[in-house]
Amino acid sequence: MSEQNNEQRSQAAGTDTVDRGNSNAKLEQLEAYREDATGEALSTNTGTRIADNQNTLKAGERGPSLLEDFIMREKITHFDHERIPERVVHARGSAAHGYFEAYEDLSDLTKAGFLAEAGKRTPVFVRFSTVQGPRGSADTVRDVRGFAVKFYTDEGNFDLVGNNMPVFFIQDAIKFPDFVHAVKPEPHNEIPTGASAHDTFWDFVSLTPESAHMVMWLMSDRAIPIAYRNMQGFGVHTFRLVNAAGESVLVKFHWRPKSGTCSLVWDEAQKLAGKDPDFNRRTLWEDIEKGDYPEWELGLQVIPENQQDSFDFDLLDPTKLVPEELVPVRVVGRMVLNRNPDNFFAETEQVAFHVGHVVPGIDFTNDPLLQGRLFSYTDTQLLRLSGPNFNEIPINRPLCPFHNNQRDAPHRQTINRGRASYEPNSIDGGWPKETPPAARNGGFSTYHEPVSGSKLRKRADSFADHFSQAALFWHSMSEAEQAHIVAAYSFELSKVERQSIREREVNQILLNIDPQLAARVAANVGVQLAAPANPTPQPKPSPALSQMNLLSGDIRSRKVAILIADGVAESDVSDLRDALRQEGADAKLIAPSASPVQAENGAELSPEGTWDGLPSVAFDAVFVPGGAASSQAIGADGRGLHYLLEAYKHLKPVAFAGDAQALASQLSLPGDPGVVLGATATDVFPGLRQALMQHRIWQREAATKAIPA
């Protein structure tokens, strides 16, 4: 290709960020599969160059189309078959490439090589998702979020397929189809999309007490994260680590975001679902493109094998968590996401995660939900990705070579040489051969766990307590978080048509968790509260469960809207942007229209969004610079006033400099730490920074109920 075309290619093609050293071995492997059409001739799938891609071959200008038109037939046929089955759950997702870096040598716990060397980096591909809705549903619905990480280790792929909540709705995989059928849109009318606020879901969970703990998480702020980078992640199940000596410990996996754990408010989440249904996807993409890489730390809760029976819950029960006050989280590494995919379908849509993708040193427990997942994930890929060769798809291929006697099937890419496709064989020298277990690069050896018992269908008695940890979660929340949980239950149950379902949820589930919770919800949904039948649990709160204790302590990655109009004080704009940039935060200029804005000093400012196109729900705070004419224009426009009032109602910091301080009086905003006033942007910034660090101004929440929506 010519030098000119090479230059065109570098300027016009690709979605990568500029080179920031963000390549890795997996991305280098994918390079062989990347296609770039810049400067190339249009051709058929078989390489024949196309002279006319505008017209079907016809008999005369106005005559019938001819069947011999192989170009049209190939194009239409391919188009007709472009869609593949979407995931049954977790269909709506977004993903990114990155790396995991180990902090220390964990050889005392596991022989997994990617955890056995301090500083060792392992490529990863991470997919975040919602659960209930289809591919086209909104990002900000109330739902569990999937948090799946594929480690491309030297010893094979390890998939940590988790969620942003540490527990699940059911204890046994046999109930998974029932749960999913219940939460999905109802079969008679395919309503609702991306929501659990309907009869079949609440019918199921009100009849399934084991779901009580997880539903409490679902009704909490954890179900409406502000961004993927602000989510915790959990492996959900208890796994097993095995070292080279064959010694085992039990482990819970945790991802802790460096950006802090925080969420939207419910009204904000609903508005974002309409105004920017791609909000979480867009934020992840844009942050990576501008080099503001999301980062998490990996933590382990390690439980010695001989202590697994020392808790008042069963470690094999996926509806239970291990409180950090009982078993502290040991931070062992970090994960950085630093590159976006080149093609959504080829990477994000075709990636295949599976809890059974493990490497030597990581093993399973007898968690009955985990055991069922070990079957389900492979089974579902056979349909979704058209057969058993899904591991040959580039995004799924391991970095290490793989050799076995699996053969043929649809879309086979490997060209196997030799005559023997079985083992043992003598024709090909017995290859490929088994690898004995070893401290490094050995074969996988299942942990020798003693097992005994009769064949039966029964839950262990240790799985029977369904309300203690739901109560633990409730009592660990702040007053604001508890109010949000009550509001969420009330909203969801108000959508339930059958009074009997509402009554059962309140009187048979919530009343067994906490009488005050049940009473507050009952009053909102028209249910007569029953007398408590049993004493309710009174657990000691776990501070680690409240998001109020999980903020980052800085304002990195926060986004501030700067409202501008003609006559704005340009110095306030530049000073605040500079101050935010130094803290790792970002700001965008938002104006009445996309036309350039003339500052009071004659400078021309280019808006990066409009009041209608980038509403306040897209930002963490709003700042209005000084400038008499600009402030008057904003105060005379209902859209500008709504922008500020909506941000205030959503408990966000709103800051005013110079002449713009009059807007706070015009809107009758009561004084609180989030209403920041100052003569200049420099005066405003310390208070704005402090308010941003708190995420939201929770003490304002009660007062905002008087503000019309």
Swiss-Prot record:
InterPro entries: Catalase (IPR018028), Catalase_AS (IPR024708), Catalase_clade2 (IPR024712), Catalase_clade2_helical (IPR043156), Catalase_core (IPR011614), Catalase_haem_BS (IPR002226), Catalase_immune_responsive (IPR010582), Catalase_large_C (IPR041399). Gene3D superfamilies: 1.20.1370.20, 3.40.50.880, Catalase core domain. Transmembrane segments: none annotated. Keywords: Cytoplasm, Heme, Hydrogen peroxide, Iron, Metal-binding, Oxidoreductase, Peroxidase. The keyword Oxidoreductase applies. It comes from the Bacteria. The active site is at 90, 163. Its cofactor is heme. Residues 1-32, 419-443 are annotated as: Disordered. Its EC number is 1.11.1.6. Heme binds at residue 377. GO terms for cellular component: cytosol. Belongs to the catalase family. HPII subfamily. This is Catalase HPII. The lineage of its organism: Bacteria, Pseudomonadati, Pseudomonadota, Gammaproteobacteria, Pseudomonadales. The gene is katE.
